[in-house]
């Protein structure tokens, strides 16, 4: 693996009475996905492995950033433990899944993405806001 891209899900919709896993995106979330998609297309080829939280907002973030790219052949894995994983679980998942892939995307949640970013780099952001790509 030469690139690891961490994406916190886009801004979620808090209207309605739905459980946390079923919350979708709000208007701001959809808009930021369009911006992120355009910017990523300028900088990288389409990633060849996606590890995504089972939360609806994470799945919608993936769909709205990557599904309009030209290449439709994805290695997409919805990983149940990305919803409430520990740093150790994420590191084990990366070690077991990423061999043979050049660019891997994880779409998930804080605080774990923030912890992983700090574990892998010393120049990370202080806080990972929604839909930040690092």
Predicted features, each with a name:
Residues 81-99:
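Short phosphate-binding loop-to-helix
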